Each structure stands twice: as C-alpha cells, then as structure tokens.
Amino acid sequence: MTVRDKYLIKIKKIADRRDPYVWGGQGQLLRRTPIYKIAEMEKSQKDYLRVCNYIHSRVSLGADMRDCRIWDCSGLVTYLLMKLHVIGGDTTAQGIYNMYTRHISLDSISPGDLVFKGADVNHITHVATYIGNNKIVEAKGRDDGVCYSLFVKSQWIAAGDPFDY
C-alpha cells in the first residue's frame, strides 16, 4: 500500500466521522479540548456558537464524538501528511501550496492530490483533498465540519501533488 493510499484511507475515515471544524484546529481530541479553549481559538462569539451548534446537532443525532478531533482546512491536511512523514511541518493552505506540492493542472488531478481556493495562487485561503469520482474531502467550515463535497473545477484555482514535490 502506498503512502498516498494510506493518506486517502485516513482522510476518508475523518470525513465519515464528520469531525468538527474549529479555526486553528490541528487534530486536537475534542474530548480533551476544554470548551473555553475552543472559544479562544474562534474569531468571534458567533463562530464559537456555530461550532457548539454543530457539535450539539451531531450528538443529538446519535453521533459518537469520543474519537473526534477538531480541524481547520490546513490543519487537517498537514496533520495527516506529517503523520505519514510526507512533510516536515505545519503550515497554512498557502504554505502547503508553496512548499509541499508539485503544481499540477486541475485537469490532471488524481486521488490524493490537493486542490486550492483563493483569489489567485499568491492568495490561497483553502485546501481540500481530491478523492476521485468528482469528490473532495474538506474541513469545510463551522456548519459542516469535515465532509465530502462535490468537486466543481471552476471553484478551485490550483492543484498540487503532495506525494511528488
């Protein structure tokens, strides 16, 4: 099994679990993260309440949150790539694009490649993982957590291969 295959298995497991999105989340266990710490991490009380509502709705629907971790988009990608010894350090979506990917065309992406959003390649603000069949896994936001989304090429500005940079 390749490192790319291991990465895809791990990121899909997190998406299946629907882990929460928290600004600055880098894989901290939810059950070990005090609620005041989440409030400190979030940019506003409104965003903090959105996170709380997401967690509450998942629990009220019967989700087992004991193994959940908190993520933001770059925290999710860098955590997994660091665990698999693909990259050496944590960074932003922009940093992932600049330092840890071989830039490729959005037309030639394959499962495990990363896709990026932003105003342009010098102002990247979001990263997700392409998993094939026009689907991505992303730490989408406070109302959605880590989830599967449809890949719509026109919504993304760049792509990169983190396994061959």
Spell out what each predicted region is:
Residues T2-L8, T78, H85-K153, P162-Y165:
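...with weaker cross-activation on analogous glycine-rich loops/strands in unrelated enzymes
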Residues M1-L84, V137-A139, F163-D164:
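N-terminal capping segments
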